[in-house]
Amino acid sequence: MKPHSVFADSLWPSIDLLYDYAPFLQQSMVDGHIGFFPTGITPPRVAIIGAGISGLIAATELLRAGVRDITLFEARDRLGGRAWSQLFDPHYYPRLIAEMGAMRFPPSATGLFHYLNRFSIQTSASFPDPGIVDTELHYRGVRHLWPAGEQPPALFTRVHNGWRALLYEGCLLDGVSLVGPLQITAMLKSERFDEAAEAWQIWLNVFRDCSFYSAMVTIFTGTNPPGGIAWERRDDFELFGALGIGSGGFLPVYQAGFTEILRMVINGYEDDQRLIIGGISTLAEQLARQEIRGTTPGRHVRFSKVNRISKDNGKISLATDVKPVDAFDRVIVTSNNRAMQMVHGLSADETFLNQDVCRAVRETHLTGSSKLFMLTRDKFWLKNKLPLTIQSDGLVRGVYVLDYESDNPEGRGVVLLSYTWEDDAHKLLAITDKKQRGQHLVDELSAIHPEFARYLVPAGADYERYVLHHDWLTDPCSAGAFKLNYPGEDVYSQRLFFQFKTANHPEQDSGLLLAGCGCSFTGGWVEGAVQTAVNSACAVIRSTGGTLYGNPLDSVHSIYDY
């Protein structure tokens, strides 16, 4: 996989926002800031809760704008939050990582790639998604080979062709014409935003209250199914659940909202997915140590948990583990949605958020997700011509081999042995010991692919050091992996994302702002963290007397009926 520093050749905005953050951020590099404070205006004292990607970007842009009194509070003992590239052994293998959080990075995430380029962080040519690399699909006990770049195995032809037809051609339901999602992408790329918005609103009108599964049944068992052949219940829908939409099987998230899945396709997040050579944590590290006006964001980090947030005499007070009360003019909360509710108490009353936003904080669905990685003695798949990814309908849903040192074919291997969502992840919570879990997964894999499984022993048989796993549902700082709306919940994303607009209305401005991917339309993607970080920084500047030009506060509008 050839490394390169990539920026999308053709930038386009995401469908729900119709605003591309990259040009604004690029212009800020020319200007030296996203905004500033005129002479005579004292910049505010700001707290940022969470030193993940969102918190660090918000701090970066506020420091560049001239805000000096900033404190980032981080409950973990590390930076990055859920953007976590865990090292197997920093001394012996400093380049070999386990991406415990985000691990796929599409260039259509233009805000993210702006910051990757700013720090010259490289990506590799592709993530080993099914069909992109040599793949094996195991379904009902039968092995199906899928060579890289070719059509899926014959068993999957009907569901594959039907899904592709839907993406390119759309469908006709009860006299309503729905434009193909990839046609909407083309509209965004060619700046036909009014057409794109109209087309997306029709999808929202028809499917806002439908699950992924129920929508697929409606579309593909009707009288005019995309691809021309109706799907058979239940076999074809199980097949499609195993095949997925590009990045592996989606059966565990069939109950998610259909529009939540569709927007990922329209936004291009399922295409050209990249690996970051040093892991996404390199972005957090670079953000933290960059020099800005004689300081760095990292010097403003306080490793302390923020508990309740309250208001006192016009200031916002934070109760922390090490100091009873700290008062600030503005607070940006990038914590996970469940921490916002259960730790900070933001949804208990209307001190900071109105009832609609409080409900969105409380009710937004977060997925459970688990990962288990193994560092192997060598890159056995190269020597033995084994598949680079295995997808199955068993306990071991998705296996991926990850090559972070493509220039060293004789080096150690990294295998993502188990990446699961929702019920599939919940099952694994019963096996808390990572050695037992790893061995159990290898045993399961042995039943379908013994040639592959025989090599799954950690280097030196050291399970303690060379097997890494994490369950996001039981993570005390997260209580879930990422936002994935249920049917009817897109309105929650709308309320959370546009909360920053209160900065334009002093009578609504409580001084507290929400950020993080869980407060975006793209939960689980780093782009949502970037967008909301920039939003919150702009809101702080505007609401405290600063000056902004060409910014999302004035340019991003809520135009859809969710």
Curated annotation (Swiss-Prot):
It catalyses: L-tryptophan + O2 = indole-3-acetamide + CO2 + H2O. Its EC number is 1.13.12.3. SUPFAM superfamilies: FAD-linked reductases, C-terminal domain (SSF54373), FAD/NAD(P)-binding domain (SSF51905). Keywords: Auxin biosynthesis, Flavoprotein, FMN, Monooxygenase, Oxidoreductase. FMN binds at residues 54, 74, 76, 82, 104. Substrate binds at residue 104. GO terms for biological process: amino acid catabolic process; auxin biosynthetic process. PANTHER family: AMINE OXIDASE (PTHR10742:SF342), FLAVIN MONOAMINE OXIDASE (PTHR10742). This is Tryptophan 2-monooxygenase. The gene is iaaM.
